[in-house]
């Protein structure tokens, strides 16, 4: 199999995987009504995935040690195919959440396997990692947009049945890949983690991404409920279209080198991204649905700018243990997403939309000040 075909298969698999992860997000108001549960409980369908993505860099290095990458991909895809089809048959909140929890366990294994296949191509590592990031962003957008459309036209159960067919195709394609490498997994030790956290630069970067993804995941998770509050007759298709702005992440990830060149230093780019992120967060106080739609685009530009540059910094500040520093980065990132998928929903339910947005803005002002006061730690700024 040619390198090009192998990459196409991996990109397709990642796209479908991220679609599975985020398909529930625009459907949460519909699922909350279907299962007669609160907004907070409906938000847990996404939060549980984030939680396992957070702990996977820590535990999967031990669980999947010396397992063939293709074997990991095949077994995990079969499990995901079965569970996703089971979602289309679920008739209670408890059953749906249990199945999503099983999916949350296997999704990190597929992501790890896909990244390993791309990383083994040593001559094109940087290009392949850019492709990986773009594929995850594209998958997240496709999953959100199309799940809304399919749910409105054919019912929410068809969303998960159709994704199961897409996973079946992914399993068929993965069988065609000729790849004998082992999964490249980190097995962290407590001493190594503590040693890295003694470097204050990592405290800054990890805190930054915890807060940024808390705000990002939190706001996008409750946005469908806000739209339903403003316009009760809004269809699932229109809610799904709100997430088109997510596609800005592809543009940012593929042009970040030009953005850095313009600002000259990475930390300046981060602070510019935070400024855009804060301004767009405050724009969500507006009650005009059209303005909210375009605000999502600006919101995603700010977030993905910070995320892309922070990833580069986290992977370049140490010559050794890059696998561990990267894994810890992802853990803090997804812990922020997991907490952000639940806690803001509680605040919104108890205190309303405006108070929730002000909470997000306060956190962003705090992290902006923290970065500003810590700038001398980074040579990139000077």
Listing of model-derived features with the role each one plays in the protein:
Residues 99-136:
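Cytoplasmic helix-loop-helix junction between adjacent transmembrane helices
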Residues 266-310:
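C-terminal transmembrane helical hairpin of 12-TM major facilitator-type secondary transporters
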Residues 317-353, 360:
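A late C-terminal transmembrane helix in Major Facilitator Superfamily
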Residues 124-125, 130-178, 222:
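Helix-loop-helix hairpin linking two adjacent transmembrane segments in secondary transporters
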Residues 5-39, 57-60, 219-225:
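Extracytoplasmic
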Residues 177-205:
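Juxtamembrane intracellular "pre-TM" segments in multi-pass secondary transporters
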Residues 55-93:
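Conserved MFS/SLC helix-loop-helix module at the cytosolic interface between two early adjacent transmembrane helices
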């Amino acid at each position: 199999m040619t390198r090009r075909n192998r990459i196409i298969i991996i990109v397709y698999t990642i796209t479908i995987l991220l679609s599975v992860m985020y398909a529930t997000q625009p459907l949460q108001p519909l699922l909350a009504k279907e299962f007669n549960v609160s907004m907070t409980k409906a938000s847990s369908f996404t939060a549980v995935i984030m939680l396992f993505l957070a702990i996977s860099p820590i535990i999967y290095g031990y669980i999947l040690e010396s397992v063939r990458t293709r074997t990991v991909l095949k077994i995990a895809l079969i499990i995901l195919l079965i569970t996703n089809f089971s979602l289309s048959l679920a008739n209670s909140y408890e059953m749906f959440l249990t199945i999503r929890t099983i999916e949350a366990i296997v999704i990190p294994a597929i992501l790890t396997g896909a990244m390993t296949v791309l990383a083994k191509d040593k001559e094109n590592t940087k290009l392949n990692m850019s492709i990986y990031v773009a594929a995850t962003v594209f998958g997240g957008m496709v999953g959100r947009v199309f799940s809304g459309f399919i749910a409105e036209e054919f019912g929410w159960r068809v969303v998960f049945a159709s994704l199961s067919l897409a996973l079946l195709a992914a399993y068929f394609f993965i069988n065609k890949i000729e790849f004998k490498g082992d999964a490249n997994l980190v097995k962290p030790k407590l001493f190594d983690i503590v040693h890295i956290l003694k470097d204050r630069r990592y405290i800054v970067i990890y805190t930054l991404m915890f807060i940024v993804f808390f705000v990002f995941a939190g706001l996008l998770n409750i946005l469908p409920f806000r739209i339903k509050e403003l316009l009760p007759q809004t269809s699932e298709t229109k809610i799904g279209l709100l997430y088109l702005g997510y596609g800005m992440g592809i543009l940012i990830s593929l042009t970040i080198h030009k953005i850095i060149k313009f600002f000259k230093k990475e930390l300046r780019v981060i602070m510019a991204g935070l400024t855009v992120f804060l301004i767009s967060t405050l724009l969500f106080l507006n009650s005009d649905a059209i303005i909210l739609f375009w605000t999502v685009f600006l919101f995603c530009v700010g977030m993905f700018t910070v995320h892309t540059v922070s990833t580069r910094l986290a992977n370049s500040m140490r010559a050794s243990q890059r696998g561990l520093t990267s894994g810890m980065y992802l853990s803090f990132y997804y812990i922020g997403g997991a907490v952000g998928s639940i806690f803001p929903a509680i605040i919104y339910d108890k205190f309303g939309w405006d108070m929730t947005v002000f909470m997000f803005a306060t956190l962003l002002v705090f992290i902006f000040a923290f970065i500003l006061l810590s700038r001398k730690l980074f040579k990139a700024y000077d």
